[in-house]
Swiss-Prot record:
Subcellular location per the Swiss-Prot or TrEMBL entry: Membrane
Membrane topology designation: Single-pass membrane protein
Gene Ontology cellular component annotations, sorted alphabetically: membrane
TM annotation in the entry: 54-72
Name of this chain's protein: Putative uncharacterized protein YJL156W-A
Keywords: Membrane, Transmembrane, Transmembrane helix
């Protein structure tokens, strides 16, 4: 089950870097922020100040999590 997250401007104001430690992920480690909410996992990747790629994934197990990006301008 895949959903696209809707982000507000305030969600895009903070630029953070973290390394994804989950197996099977191929995201750029120093340009990705991982946010966990319940069973929902967000992967936010900043390309520049105006463009963010985000994947919003609901996964029952960690091994099924994949990096799927959607452009949000």
């Amino acid at each position: 089950m895949l959903k696209i997250a809707s982000l507000k401007k305030k969600d895009m104001q903070t630029k953070e870097s973290c390394i994804l430690k989950r197996p099977g992920l191929s995201c750029p480690p120093n340009k990705t922020k991982e946010v966990n909410e319940s069973k929902q996992i967000f992967f936010l990747t900043w390309k520049n100040k105006a463009t963010m790629k985000v994947s919003f994934i609901v996964a029952p197990t960690v091994m099924q999590v994949q990096c799927l990006f959607f452009f949000i301008l």
